[in-house]
Amino acid sequence: MQKLVFSRATPVVLFLAISLCSVAADEMATTNLLASQTRTFDPQLAPMSLHTRGKKVLDAGGKRVWLYGVNIASLEWSTDGEHVEESVNRAINDWKVNLIRLPLAQDRWFGKMTNQTDGGAAYRALVDKLVDACAAGRVYIDLDLHWSDCGQWMNEGGTLGQHSMPDKNSITFWQDLATRYKNQPNVIFDLYNEPHDVSFAVWRDGGTVTNTPEHKKPGQAKIIYEAVGMQTLYDTVRAVGATNLVAAGGLNWAYDLSGVLRGYGIKGTNLIYETHPYQNKTNWDKNFGDPSWKYPVYIGEWGFSAHTTNGLGYAQSLMQYARKHKLPWTAWDMHVTAGPPLIKNWDYEPTVSGQFVKEQLAAAAAAHGTNK
């Protein structure tokens, strides 16, 4: 056996070799996960392509687009979804939306759940069907990364849920999803649902965060992981050649956008900032309606008590505020249990809040028209 000769440089060389092998292995694992080819779309959809100019969202012809609709949840917690196809159909044809916000889970996208054996193919195909249904109705769809895993896939012991920040696996998710739907005119990319409990520096640039797992079991430790910032996710989308409109929710569960005015904005174009002003949130001007604001703002979630009129005053005030500031919106949620629900049952009978939202949608469609 040949004798190994070590020098002072040997530890450094070995360290570099091991590091490079580790990086190569990580890159190979990511590459093996990427499953999507860019989908083709009907050229007749081209006029729907969105871009921003100042505070406005415009279509390909430079006409201002007014966006209003609903969230349709369940694909974050269910691989097969719960009535999602029928809900999309009802939202488009009965509720007259021109925008649907669709929450997703990165682990389900890649088939990382224990009940998935196809690498996520069926899940991705279902999302394709929903995107196509929206396209056929000339309706926009906001693909929202709602649930993440703190950087560890579920089938490797991770914790899937609504965490404080995205993680390294979120980069892989956006590489694949943005490749699949890049430049499809009716698709919007929503980077991460509701960041919270971090600084605006971490929100934009990433950093180490401590996160208590959802559904925490007795004695279960907190999770410490490296969060990925919104700038990295935005850059990931653009790196695959996607020019689609990108939405970025602020802090305090996507409510607070004030840090953008303090120098923590995302560098990029075709960007819309997102806020979730639920009934318990106050001081709208400070958090997302500052007169000096230079970017489009989107109310991605809002809602009030489904079965009483207790929140009706709040809802009326918010819709007046949205009209005054010309803010697009999607109400939460067209599901019977994802609160506050807009429907009582799967016959799509509206709740009190659902009836209010349905009336607001009808008024918006009458004022601005649908995209049909």
Model region roles, listed by residue range:
Residues 11-21:
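Bacterial N-terminal signal peptides
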Residues 24-25:
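Boundary at the C-terminal end of the N-terminal hydrophobic targeting segment
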Residues 1-12:
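Bacterial N-terminal signal peptides that target proteins for export
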Residues 83-152, 167-170, 226, 231-240, ...:
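Aromatic-lined substrate-binding rim segments of carbohydrate-active enzymes
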Residues 28-101, 117, 290, 360, ...:
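N-terminal carbohydrate-binding accessory modules
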